[in-house]
């Protein structure tokens, strides 16, 4: 079976190289070189050991095949779609799933007619009733799914989506194959979700169970999602090996089939159905294929090999879509499983060996703890660099979280599955049984919340020194692995890693708190978030982004917690637009906040009401700024001015002025020049050192009147990927003419200004 692993892993290496380095002519040259080298090995029959020669040929020919296959896939599947992008054109395709509600309507995934490529159609809300199998056609603006506004994007192509279609005019929906048995798995998952909602009327439990059984956590409360992520157990909602193992165990309990072959066949069929039902994500495809290998091995009188089944699953996924190699979910799923295959048994043996007694109850507890800890630590070996790169996080509490939460999560998964199936037979009985699931869900969320309240439960790579520590730690343990077998060296390595980690964290906290006052513009893309802090006291003014791929709340919270700040003196909201507020829900879920300052204006988006509900839930004082309010901040003072303009939300926002001695920072939100003129006419603003430029550098903001009144020395523009032309040349010219030195978050990243001695 290791022959299959050699071929599959070599093929995967070729695909990863082609996708991550960029598809191009170099692939064909590299494929030719691999082919030539393989043919050379083929001729070395007498001068090279047969096994080594065969292994080398398999690797080289598989690499050649991968490079050629990826080039052909790009030319035959992606390129024809890309050629139509950037223009208006007709489309037609088969609906693959029910539409998903968006801010402006719905989004629906289709498979384009006559192609293996998928596309996402953005249309009006009237198309929310589309069903899988229907034929959808119309006219749309075609957008390349791999490149958006000069930025390379992998989120779509890794799912096989190569075009984004923005509907123009009415669409035509025909019956197609909707209702046929082909779409039974999709109908099953919709029925499952509806039954879950009927069994558990309280939204929190229903959303948790839906996420656990199907991987769909779109309706989960921000605070619940935050604590699960921070506790390191968010993988419970990525349908994977854990779920498939639970499902097979459940089938063994519900279907006590005596004949092994029949039982294995039924389990395989259910796994395949479940795989299609939850959406063919990389994690569930990998898990199901590995489970099928595990079930089939005894029937074929072979031993199951974890590396072979893992590599076979990777081969299947990459054959279906080579661009899946760039997907974060695939990389995390396979990295975690590779760690389990390589290290879990060794770690388990090590932990079990720590207890040499013979008492059965104690040995049982030791075995349980060893199995859970070894699995958690092994899964983290290769995933820590990935989570650091993609999510900026290193969860220290994850091994303990998995030990305390996974057993309950396993029981809740199996019980929820049984209860949901029972709900199709008799709903009242299912609701009674559902209380057991409710209790398990409450325990999981409570435990996750309790663990995230522990100091140092996670580290964030906003600490710029942490990446160097990570390289050091990996080098340290790698050196241990390639030297002799003495266990003591691992204890020494662990002690050194722990001590240097404490130094790394302490150094960042100390350096970040120097100065009388600090102002940081956090890079949140096209949005705004300003951190103002002095010592251990901090205020956040606005937190949001209009870029869907930017989690403004996480970025701000990561930055604050990496500086040792876990409690906010206040949060101030200039106005209620999403690019200034949609990160606040995550921020309020993760950090304790004393006071929330809001403008006393109504908004049409429901942001104010949602913030009020969160404030009430978390015990946060709410203050409406109807007159000038001063908020002490260590050695500085934050002054908040009430709205002075009229019209839309931009003109009815608050103004913030933070002063430390003679050093002043002014934040005007998104107000336009007409409102800026009212501001300087109504309030005696001082000459300022730093201006957080209004409206991301819009030509309508940063008026001459404002700049002449406050005479900023430094101008910081919070801006990112946008279609408005921000920052505009007109605004940049006015700032330059006013003598301000300009900084931009899209170019410099986070921008920090530190005040020493108030001057």
Question: How does the language model describe each region?
Answer:
Residues 1-82, 286:
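N-terminal leader/targeting segments
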Residues 2, 14, 48, 165, ...:
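Hydrophobic alpha-helical transmembrane segments in multi-pass membrane proteins
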Residues 9, 158-290, 295, 570, ...:
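Aromatic-rich juxtamembrane segments at the membrane interface
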Residues 217, 318-326, 449-570, 616-690, ...:
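Core dinuclear metal-dependent hydrolase active-site scaffold
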Residues 568-579, 601, 691-695:
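Metallo-beta-lactamase
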Residues 578-616, 712:
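Active-site HxH/HxHxD metal-binding segment of metal-dependent hydrolases
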Residues 595, 678-750:
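Cap/insert and terminal regions of metallo-dependent hydrolase folds
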């Amino acid at each position: 079976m290791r022959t299959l692993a050699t071929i599959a892993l070599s093929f995967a290496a070729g695909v990863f190289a082609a996708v991550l380095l960029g598809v191009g002519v170099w692939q064909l040259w590299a494929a030719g070189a691999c082919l030539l080298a393989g043919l050379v090995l083929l001729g070395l029959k007498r001068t090279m050991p047969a096994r080594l020669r065969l292994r080398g040929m398999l690797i080289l020919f598989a690499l050649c095949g991968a490079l050629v296959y990826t080039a052909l896939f790009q030319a035959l599947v992606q390129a024809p779609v890309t050629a139509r992008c950037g223009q208006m054109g007709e489309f037609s395709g088969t609906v693959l799933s029910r539409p998903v509600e968006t801010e402006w309507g719905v989004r629906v995934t289709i498979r384009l007619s006559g192609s293996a490529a998928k596309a996402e159609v953005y249309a009006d809300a009237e198309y929310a009733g589309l069903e899988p199998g229907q034929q959808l056609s119309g006219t749309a603006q075609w957008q390349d799914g791999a490149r958006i506004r000069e930025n390379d994007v992998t989120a779509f192509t890794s799912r096989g989506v190569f075009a984004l279609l923005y509907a123009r005019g009415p669409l035509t929906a025909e019956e197609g194959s909707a209702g046929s048995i082909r779409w039974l798995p999709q109908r099953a998952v919709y029925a499952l979700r509806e039954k879950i909602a009927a069994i558990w009327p309280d939204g929190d439990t229903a959303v948790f169970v839906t996420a656990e059984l199907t991987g769909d956590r779109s309706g989960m409360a921000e605070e619940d999602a935050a604590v699960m992520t921070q506790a390191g157990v968010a993988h419970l909602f990525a349908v994977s090996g854990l779920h498939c193992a639970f499902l097979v165990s459940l089938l063994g309990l519900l279907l006590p089939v005596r004949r092994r072959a029949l039982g294995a066949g039924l389990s395989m069929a259910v796994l395949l159905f479940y795989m299609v039902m939850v959406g063919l994500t990389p994690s569930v495809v990998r898990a199901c294929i590995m489970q099928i290998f595990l079930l089939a091995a005894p029937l074929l009188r072979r031993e199951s090999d974890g590396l072979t089944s893992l590599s076979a699953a990777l081969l299947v996924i990459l054959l279906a879509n080579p661009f899946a190699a760039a997907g974060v979910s695939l990389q995390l799923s396979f990295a975690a499983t590779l760690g389990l295959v390589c290290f879990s048994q060794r770690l388990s043996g090590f932990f079990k060996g720590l207890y040499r007694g013979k008492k059965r109850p104690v040995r049982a507890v030791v075995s349980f703890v060893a199995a859970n800890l070894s699995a958690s630590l092994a899964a983290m070996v290769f995933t820590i660099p990935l989570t650091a790169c993609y999510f900026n996080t290193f969860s220290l509490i994850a091994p303990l979280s998995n030990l305390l939460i996974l057993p309950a999560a396993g029981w809740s998964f199996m019980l929820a599955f049984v209860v949901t199936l029972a709900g199709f037979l008799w709903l009242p009985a299912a609701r009674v049984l559902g209380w057991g699931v409710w209790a398990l869900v409450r325990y999981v969320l409570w435990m996750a919340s309790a663990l995230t309240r522990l100091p140092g439960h996670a580290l964030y790579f906003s600490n710029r020194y942490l990446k160097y520590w990570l390289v050091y730690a990996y080098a340290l343990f790698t050196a241990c692995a390639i030297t002799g077998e003495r266990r003591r060296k691992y204890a020494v390595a662990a002690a050194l890693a722990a001590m240097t980690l404490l130094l790394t964290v302490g150094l960042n906290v100390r350096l970040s708190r120097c100065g009388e006052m600090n102002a940081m513009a956090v890079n949140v893309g096209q949005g705004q978030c300003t951190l103002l802090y002095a010592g251990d006291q901090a205020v956040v003014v606005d937190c949001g982004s209009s870029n869907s791929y930017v989690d403004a709340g996480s970025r701000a919270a990561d930055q604050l917690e990496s500086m040792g700040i876990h409690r906010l003196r206040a949060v101030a909201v200039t106005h209620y637009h999403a690019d200034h507020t949609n990160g606040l829900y995550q921020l309020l879920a993760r950090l304790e906040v004393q006071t929330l300052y809001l403008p006393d204006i109504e908004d049409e988006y429901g942001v104010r009401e949602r913030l009020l509900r969160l404030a009430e839930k978390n015990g946060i004082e709410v203050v409406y700024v109807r007159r000038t309010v001063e908020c002490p901040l260590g050695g500085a003072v934050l002054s908040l001015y009430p709205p002075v303009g009229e019209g839309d939300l931009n003109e009815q926002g608050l103004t913030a002025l933070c002063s430390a001695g003679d050093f002043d920072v002014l934040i005007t939100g998104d107000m336009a020049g007409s409102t800026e003129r009212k501001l300087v006419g109504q309030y005696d603003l001082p000459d300022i050192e730093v201006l957080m430029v209004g409206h991301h550098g819009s030509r309508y903001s940063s008026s001459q009147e404002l700049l002449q009144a406050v005479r900023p020395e430094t101008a910081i523009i919070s801006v990112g990927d946008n279609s408005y032309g921000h920052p505009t040349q007109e605004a940049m010219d006015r700032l330059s003419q006013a003598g301000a030195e300009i900084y931009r978050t899209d170019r410099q990243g986070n921008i920090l200004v530190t005040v020493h001695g108030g001057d």
